[in-house]
């Protein structure tokens, strides 16, 4: 019983123990969380939560897991990847990583990565294998391959394992490049072989492409192996020039120069020479070389040209330099060479046209006839007035340059001066007054022109152009042409086969002969001007008298017109101004045109021609001429015409004589005698009637009358009271017969018999009409006075 009870107690104790043990192992998750939280609160436990919050890690355990991951991943792990794999926050992992780096110096922390020492040893082994295969390796390439900084690879991997794991040599010029000695030996052999096979200048780039080595290594090795040539530079465009090629260049240049005395630049450049001129000088140090554009020549060739030129000058002939010089020389080369050879005295004795040299003596013998042509043409230009027109255009062109204000003031002063002199002339006598005015006019029209002709512009290039207007080209004249000179030269040059130079030579001599012709024309012009000036005073006086006579005639005719009925006067005034007024106007305009050297061909002028002269003449004439032309064309009142006519005379420096009634009576008497003389010699019935009526009017009124045939009827009606009845009847009958004759003559041929009958009647009455006019005496009418 007791043993059973003990057994029961033992079993109960075991059971209780079992119960207690089982309860400890089966704590619920909630209980565990509470227990851990309690430990953390009391500071007895430090844990790290996973990102999902389901697990706890201690710092030591996390450090161990990081190391395990580094080992699993081959000694290199990224903290970002590590954070994801361990499901731990990145900052916690970074803190642990920094602790590992501090505790273990063999571990490196680079760019967010942990790298073990054995990983770096493995990379060093791989680099060594690649270096052995390729022969050369660049840290930059390794940086791309391993995704590590260049400094880290260079300092922590390559240099630390150089000549241990990595068997190679660092480049002295570039610390990032490593190569093996065998690679250098192979490359040197390639370079040596390539350079030995080259016989002409070859680009270094072509050599590198053929050998398959980098230019850096080539530049390193070329000085060691280039015993048969040289490299021009270390730039990408460098050339390798073999010594054999340089030797061939030098021999070719020396031999060619020795045989020909010159070297063509293109030929030397074709040998591969870049600086041709310096190369020639270096290869021919003892020669006096002259560099031209396309070639370089030696002293021997220059002396040959000089001797040929001296012979040409001494014999007064010509020389074609192309026969002495090489054919490859351009015109510019020839010019440069001749500039060197020709001395100052020689240059005065020759003319150069491309490659042909003519002596001046040779040309002057052929060109002598041109002097006669120039003189002859100059004389013709003066005789025809062409040179005078040129001088006028030139003078007007220069006058246009003067400012308007200054020009107006000068002209006003001159006009005042002329008026003062005109007043002085009237006081001292007509002849003296005219002389004073003539001198003033001469000074205005000729003096400035002489100054213009003395300028150098007279001898400029000749080309016809219109002058005298603003904006026009400079006035010029061509007295001798290039064609004239060329024609003279062509004959002499053709004999020598140089006719192609005729035009060029003519163009060369053209300015000289143009100046000669202009100078001769000016000389002849001055002579003719002097001769013309001697007659100018008398011509001016004659024109003044003529215009005074016309002026007085118009004035006296106006008095006669005023005696007629008012309805007849306008027609007679119009006829008077259209005839005598136009004559007066034309004389004034012809005079001004001559003074201003304007074109005024013909004996009469139309209204348009007079307008053009008024527009082109000097300012001192323009206003008066325009008013005169307007008054003449409008045929208004005679008084208005006489006013503008007097103004035009003053503008032309002419004096209007005072009215003298005694002279007026003499003029009327002379006019009557003139009409009687015409009547005595006249046989035409219409003209007989016209003259008879005018004579009767002059005698009966003691006034002159200027009328046309259409006004005969009106005048005859006016004279009826002054005639005897039989005289009036005779004149009326004669007048009717004249009208009948004119109408019959304009009719058909059937009226021919009537015309003959009328003519017979007129022939019978004509002596009677002439007798009436010739013997008529004033009876009962007061005179015009």
UniProtKB/Swiss-Prot annotation:
Compositionally biased tracts (Basic residues): 439-449
Any single GO CC term annotated in Swiss-Prot or TrEMBL for this entry: endoplasmic reticulum membrane
Domain of life of the organism encoding this protein: Eukaryota
Keyword field: Transferase, Ubl conjugation pathway
Region of interest: Disordered: 396-473
Biased composition range(s): Basic and acidic residues: 396-416
Presence of keyword Membrane: no
Ranges in coiled-coil conformation: none
Biological processes annotated in GO: protein K69-linked ufmylation; regulation of proteasomal ubiquitin-dependent protein catabolic process; response to endoplasmic reticulum stress
Entry's EC annotation: 2.3.2.-
Main function: E3 UFM1-protein ligase that mediates ufmylation of target proteins.
Family of the protein in this entry: Belongs to the UFL1 family.
Protein name as it appears in the record: E3 UFM1-protein ligase 1 homolog
Species this chain originates from: Culex quinquefasciatus
């Amino acid at each position: 019983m007791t043993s059973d009870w003990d057994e029961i107690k033992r079993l109960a104790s075991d059971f209780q123990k079992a119960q207690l043990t089982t309860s400890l192992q089966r704590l619920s998750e909630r209980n565990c969380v509470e227990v851990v939280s309690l430990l953390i609160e009391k500071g007895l436990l430090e844990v790290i939560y996973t990102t999902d919050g389901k697990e706890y890690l201690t710092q030591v355990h996390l450090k161990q897991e990081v190391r395990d991951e580094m080992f699993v991943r081959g000694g290199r792990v990224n903290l970002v990847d590590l954070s994801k794999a361990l499901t731990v926050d990145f900052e916690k992992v970074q803190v642990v990583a920094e602790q590992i780096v501090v505790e273990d110096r063999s571990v490196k922390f680079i760019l967010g990565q942990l790298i073990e020492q054995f990983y770096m040893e493995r990379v060093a082994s791989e680099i060594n294998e690649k270096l052995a295969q390729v022969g050369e390796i660049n840290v930059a390439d390794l940086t791309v391959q391993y995704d590590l900084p260049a400094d880290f690879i260079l300092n922590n991997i390559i240099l630390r394992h150089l000549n241990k794991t990595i068997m190679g040599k660092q480049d002295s010029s570039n610390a990032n490049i490593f190569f093996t000695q065998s690679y250098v030996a192979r490359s040197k052999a390639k370079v040596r072989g390539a350079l030995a096979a080259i016989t002409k200048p070859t680009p270094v780039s072509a050599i590198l492409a053929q050998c398959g080595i980098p230019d850096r290594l080539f530049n390193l090795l070329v000085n060691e192996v280039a015993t048969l040539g040289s490299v021009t530079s270390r730039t990408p465009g460098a050339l390798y020039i073999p010594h054999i090629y340089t030797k061939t260049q030098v021999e070719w240049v020396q031999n060619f120069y020795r045989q020909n005395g010159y070297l063509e630049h293109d030929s030397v450049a074709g040998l591969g020479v870049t600086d041709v001129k310096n190369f020639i000088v270096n290869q021919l140090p003892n020669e006096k070389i002259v560099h031209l554009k396309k070639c370089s020549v030696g002293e021997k060739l220059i002396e040959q040209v000089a001797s040929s030129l001296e012979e040409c000058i001494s014999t007064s002939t010509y020389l074609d330099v192309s026969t002495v010089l090489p054919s490859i020389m351009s015109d510019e080369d020839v010019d440069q060479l001749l500039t060197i050879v020709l001395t100052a005295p020689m240059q005065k004795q020759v003319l150069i046209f491309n490659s042909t040299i003519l002596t001046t003596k040779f040309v002057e013998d052929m060109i002598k006839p041109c002097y006669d042509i120039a003189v002859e043409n100059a004389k013709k230009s003066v005789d025809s007035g062409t040179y005078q027109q040129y001088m006028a255009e030139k003078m007007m062109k220069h006058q246009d340059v003067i400012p308007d204000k200054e020009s107006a003031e000068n002209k006003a002063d001159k006009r005042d001066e002329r008026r003062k002199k005109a007043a002085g002339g009237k006081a001292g006598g007509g002849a003296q007054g005219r002389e004073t005015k003539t001198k003033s006019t001469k000074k205005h029209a000729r003096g400035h022109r002489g100054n213009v002709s003395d300028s150098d512009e007279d001898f400029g290039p000749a080309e016809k152009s219109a002058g005298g207007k603003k904006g026009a080209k400079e006035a010029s004249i061509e007295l001798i042409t290039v064609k004239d000179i060329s024609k003279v030269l062509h004959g002499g040059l053709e004999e020598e086969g140089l006719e192609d130079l005729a035009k060029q030579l003519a163009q060369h001599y053209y300015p000289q002969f143009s100046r000669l012709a202009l100078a001769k024309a000016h000389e002849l012009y001055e002579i003719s001007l002097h001769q013309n000036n001697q007659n100018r005073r008398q011509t001016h006086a004659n024109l003044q008298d003529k215009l005074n006579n016309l002026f007085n005639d118009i004035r006296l005719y106006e008095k006669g017109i005023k005696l007629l009925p008012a309805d007849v006067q306008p027609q007679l005034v119009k006829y008077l101004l259209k005839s005598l007024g136009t004559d007066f106007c034309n004389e004034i305009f012809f005079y001004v045109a001559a003074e201003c050297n304007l074109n005024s061909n013909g004996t009469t002028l139309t209204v348009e021609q007079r307008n053009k002269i008024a527009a082109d003449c000097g300012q001192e004439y323009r206003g008066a001429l325009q008013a005169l032309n307007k008054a003449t064309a409008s045929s208004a009142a005679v008084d208005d015409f006489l006013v503008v006519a007097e103004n035009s005379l003053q503008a032309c420096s002419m004096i209007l004589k005072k009215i003298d009634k005694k002279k007026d009576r003499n003029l009327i008497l002379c006019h009557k005698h003139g009409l009687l003389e015409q009547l005595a010699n006249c046989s035409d019935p219409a003209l007989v009637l016209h003259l008879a009526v005018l004579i009767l009017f002059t005698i009966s009124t003691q006034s002159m009358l200027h009328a046309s045939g259409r006004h005969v009827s009106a005048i005859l009606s006016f004279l009826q009271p002054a005639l005897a009845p039989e005289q009036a009847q005779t004149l009326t009958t004669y007048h009717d017969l004249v009208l009948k004759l004119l109408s019959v003559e304009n009719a058909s041929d059937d009226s021919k018999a009537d015309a003959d009958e009328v003519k017979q009647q007129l022939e019978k009455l004509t002596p009677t009409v002439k007798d009436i006019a010739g013997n008529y005496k004033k009876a009962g009418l007061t005179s015009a006075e």
